[in-house]
Regions:
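Nucleic-acid-processing active sites and adjacent nucleic-acid-binding tracks
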Residues: 63-67
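Conserved SAM/SAH-binding loop
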Residues: 6-11
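Extreme N-terminal starter segment of soluble prokaryotic enzymes
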Residues: 1-4
Length: 235
């Protein structure tokens, strides 16, 4: 079952007892101004050699990323979940001692961040996964193999559509669930954003409880999820 609400995450979490969720997979505020992305054009070279000028998504500027998530949030998150995967660990002034997951976005030749780092309470090692995620340049598969990760999705119409400035790909969440969650685990996401995790949980049949405070993002994510669910039903 997927349960998603339009509310503050602290209000959601306070309704649950200690250790209710087996795994929280969250992407809180980093405090780096990601709510006001620049609107610069990109160039995309097709597999047939054609170069396209691609406009960046015209995201509405908002005010949710002026400061990173605080200790009150992390204390509550750790109370309600047995284990956590927390993106943006390098931005937080909070003791998150444990493993790390590094997502290599294969952005070496761009001005975008080369990778993103997550805290992983399930172990103390560092795991690296590679998936191309740079505008129109999206990977065909998510893998630890650097050579395979460089293969692009050739048909750009199959690319994942962006609806949120910090959107993470569905394939990344599927990889996290396959590698770190167990069958029957209850999953928590306190910052739904684009809803990618909801699609991944739907595909892999995990129960998800999630919330999104921003009404615009909430509505867009719910529409995205409903369309995906209808398409899966049809095919």
């Amino acid at each position: 079952m997927i349960q998603i609400s339009n509310e503050d995450n602290m209000e959601l979490m306070k309704r649950y007892p200690d250790n209710y969720f087996e795994l929280a997979i969250v992407d809180p505020e980093y405090g780096i101004g990601a709510d006001k992305p620049s609107r610069k054009p990109n160039k995309c070279k097709q597999s047939n050699g054609t170069v396209l000028n691609v406009k960046s998504p015209n995201y509405t500027h908002k005010n949710w990323d002026s400061k990173p998530a605080d200790s009150r949030y992390f204390d509550e998150l750790k109370r309600v979940s047995k284990n956590q995967i927390i993106w943006g660990v390098n931005y937080y002034d909070y003791n998150l001692t444990g493993g790390r997951i590094i997502w290599d976005k294969l952005n070496d030749s761009s001005d975008q961040f080369d990778c993103e780092i997550a805290y992983n309470s399930l172990n103390k090692r560092t795991d690296i996964v590679r998936y191309m995620w740079r505008g129109m340049f999206q990977g065909l598969s998510i893998t630890k193999n650097a050579h395979k990760a460089l293969i692009q999705q050739g048909n750009k119409s199959k690319n994942e559509k962006r609806i949120h400035p910090t959107q993470k790909p569905v394939k990344l969440y599927e990889w996290l669930l396959i590698n770190y969650a167990k069958e029957g685990d209850k999953i928590l996401d306190t910052h739904l954003g684009s809803g990618s995790i909801a699609i991944a949980c739907h595909n892999l049949k995990f129960d998800l409880t999630a919330c999104e405070l921003d009404k615009d993002y909430f509505d867009a994510a719910m529409l995205r999820l409903r369309i995906h669910q209808m398409q899966k039903t049809l095919f």
